[in-house]
Amino acid sequence: LNPYEIVKQQIDVAANILQLPSHVVEIVKRPKRVVSVSFPVKMDDGSVRIFEGFRSQHTDVLGPTKGGIRFHPDVTMDEVKALSMWMTFKCGVVGLPYGGGKGGVICDVKTMSRGEVERVSRGFMEAIADVVGPEKDIPAPDVYTNPQVMGWMMDTYSRIKGFYSPGVITGKPLIVGGSKGRNEATAQGCVYAIIADRKSTRLNS
């Protein structure tokens, strides 16, 4: 199923329960901004390959958009749109002052060298540098991206802007301003959710 169609169906269900006005529903169903980019990367064999990527920013009503960047051969625009919307909802549920963002590059890192992954990382950041930033949109790691990729992207953004800007990216290596515990944070959050669910189940049984 198309993830963008799925999230729109979920919004319809929630809107019906909450009795939201139709114009609010239509606003929520559409990301504020979706950027599609293509950029050249020199491969190890000397050839030049064009990569495609996307960045979706769902809403910045509560603050900058926030969400991961994934490297995967199956990345689509509809996927990143849906994921950016789910990020908005996740931030809203826990009261974080962020909207949802998500991005991705169509590539298969399993077939690429470290140098090629670095050049793709830097090339994508160069392509989206005008629409991200500490006060605009803050990317993070996701599928097949990691602290090293975030470090390359942060370095590229800082070079473009002319000043050191660690706030543009989360999930960076500690040595360049990353946060302790970031690698374990998602799994730890799942643990807390399971514990809370078990407590709730016992209370309601």
Enumerate the language-model features and the residues they cover.
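Conserved small/polar residues in nucleotide/adenosyl-binding loops
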Residues: 199-205
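N-terminal ligand-binding/catalytic initiation module
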Residues: 1-185, 191-193
